[in-house]
């Protein structure tokens, strides 16, 4: 891989600088060039404002269409009526309670017969290591 030489740009920049900054050059040409640059900068600012305006208009349109699509447009729609009613919430509560009862039925307790038969005996405990 060949390394690029960054010093090759310096003579080009020096010659460009000498062309733009000629001592004793024509002042009227400089003034005409500067006035044209000012006019171009006004057009550049106008172009930037136009691009930003189009971008803002486009963004606003997308935002408004998104907000409009999220509104409940068809209130007579059976699905929306069902969601607004509390019937599905009551059914959900009943289903949840049934599932909880099923899970309790599936659980069972293993009983230690020695502890039940001799409750007075001392059971060993773990002591904290503090």
From Swiss-Prot:
InterPro entries reported in the protein's UniProt record: K_chnl_KCNE (IPR000369), KCNE1 (IPR005424)
Q: What induces it?
A: By estrogen.
Tissue specificity here reads: Expressed in the heart. Expressed in kidney. Expressed in estrogen-induced uterus.
PTM section of the record = Phosphorylation inhibits the potassium current.
Cellular location(s): Cell membrane; Apical cell membrane; Membrane raft
Which keywords are on file for this protein? Answer: Cell membrane, Glycoprotein, Ion channel, Ion transport, Membrane, Phosphoprotein, Potassium, Potassium channel, Potassium transport, Transmembrane, Transmembrane helix, Transport, Voltage-gated channel
GO molecular function term, any single one: voltage-gated potassium channel activity
- Transmembrane ranges, per UniProt, are 45-67
> How does this protein sit in the membrane?
Single-pass type I membrane protein
Which residues, by range, are in coiled-coil regions? Answer: none
One cellular component term (GO) for this entry is:
voltage-gated potassium channel complex
Biological process, per Gene Ontology: cardiac muscle cell action potential involved in contraction; cellular response to acidic pH; cellular response to cAMP; cellular response to light stimulus; epithelial cell maturation; heart contraction; male gonad development; membrane repolarization
Q: Which residues lie on this side of the membrane: Cytoplasmic?
A: 68-130
User: Quaternary structure?
Assistant: Interacts with KCNB1. Interacts with KCNC2. Associates with KCNH2/HERG. Interacts with KCNQ1; targets the complex KCNQ1-KCNE1 to the membrane raft.
This chain's protein is named Potassium voltage-gated channel subfamily E member 1
Question: Which species does the entry assign this protein to?
Answer: Rattus norvegicus (Rat)
Recorded name of the encoding gene: Kcne1
């Amino acid at each position: 891989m060949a390394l690029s030489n960054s010093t090759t740009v310096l003579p080009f920049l020096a010659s460009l600088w000498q062309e733009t900054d000629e001592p004793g050059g024509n002042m009227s040409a400089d003034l005409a060039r500067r006035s044209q640059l000012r006019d171009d900068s006004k057009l550049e600012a106008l172009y930037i404002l136009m691009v930003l305006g189009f971008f803002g208009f486009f963004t606003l349109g997308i935002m408004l269409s998104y907000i409009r699509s999220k509104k409940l447009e068809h209130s007579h729609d059976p699905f929306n009526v069902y969601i607004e009613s509390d019937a599905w919430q009551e059914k959900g509560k009943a289903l949840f309670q049934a599932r909880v009862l099923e899970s309790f039925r599936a659980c069972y307790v293993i009983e230690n017969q020695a502890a039940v038969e001799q409750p007075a005996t001392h059971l060993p405990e773990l002591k904290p290591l503090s």
